Amino acid sequence: MRMDKSCCWEGDFSALLRGKVAFLVGRVCLVSVNTASCPVCGCPMIRHGRTSSGRQRWRCKPCKITTLNEIDSTAKHLDEFLAWLLSRRRQADLPGGGRSFRRRCEPLWQLWPFSPIVDEVHDVIFVDGIHLGRGAVVLIAQTPDCVLGWYAARSENSRAWEALMSRIAPPALVVTDGGSGFAKACKRIWPTTRIQRCTFHAYCRIRQAATTRPKLAASQGLYALGQQLLHVEDREEAQEWIGAYQDWCTRWKDFLEEKTRRPDGGWEYTHERLVRARNSLNKLIRQGLLFTYLDPTWDQPMPATTNQIESTNARLRQMLRDHRGMRLTRRMKAVFWWCYTHSAHPQPAARILATMPTDADLENAWYNASQTHQATAIIPGWGDAICWNELHHTTPYHNTWD
């Protein structure tokens, strides 16, 4: 017979008989490869019957405890879950119509893959937000190579941007589409970082005001300037564009100042959309955010648009369409998982399960924080409570008057 066991012994190894039988002098301890180890002392365990369901029971002789040798397949299920989420496969096409897959992956939806802290300084970072509905948006920051961070919020505001940017080292340049609250957050968190407003979004603002088939001469001139804005490649062309834009503002100044009376008696600009586009461009030129990428101090070509992160948003929307029907929290977690798998150093599944928090962990954290806040509010401090001695006397009160 063939021995498929690893042997450890105390004593002298005597001889091998024809390569089949081992004679051991002294005490012999044969440990099978499939033997379970004791969770307390680490010694090998022996088989000790089976449970009512037919599973093998194991017993440790020194500790005299019994246990079941369970195999944790959660990491394998997480890899399967991520492979499905990042693909275009439908659950209906999986074996069994996806019922077994949903049962295996149900606990994995409890995980929250949070973004890591990025201490590496990058030359350029793109920021944008993908809206998942009227009450949720995921803010994303990335480089041309990988995703750096993500943050879920109710809307794009300065507090949400600060929460995202505080975990990332300030870059040399950040390219944005001009989202609400970003400028304020950047001034506080990344004060030394220069901002480049996406020129394509500036063009879209012009196109929205003038339309693609303008009828008015002022709209035609502004739309032509918007098309030229996308092809500015050096400082000389930028100065020429700014000069042409200023000429347009001077020529149509009186036209843009025309006002019309509303039915309620108030006044409004007759060409309000053109006025808004003009004010937006004036602000970008005045703050120097339109042609930051053409600064001669850069030692490498800098991007003028957010095309890189817009491509990421397109892939995220495609993923949500492929797996449409998920509720809001799962759509949010799906975006989180995509960003995490496309980050610089994603961890293996086993490490993710050991480090990433779950819904229960977040609920406990919020509960503990609320309890601490209540205790702090209940316990009085100096100057926020009435002292007993201020309203009472320690000596007895004598009512001796008539």
What are these regions (language model features)?
Residues 1-36:
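A broadly conserved sequence feature marking short terminus-proximal activation segments
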Residues 43-46, 68:
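Short functional micro-motifs and their immediate structural scaffolds
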Residues 47-57:
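Short linker/helix segments within small regulatory modules
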Residues 85-95:
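Short, charged amphipathic recognition helices of the HTH superfamily
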Residues 57, 62-64, 68-75, 80-81, ...:
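Acidic/histidine-rich catalytic cores and adjacent linkers
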Residues 177-226:
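Conserved beta-strand -> loop -> alpha-helix junction used to position metal-binding or nucleic-acid-contacting
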Residues 38-41, 60:
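Short cysteine-rich clusters marking metal-coordination/redox-active sites
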Residues 30-33, 55, 59, 65-69, ...:
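RNase H-like nuclease fold core
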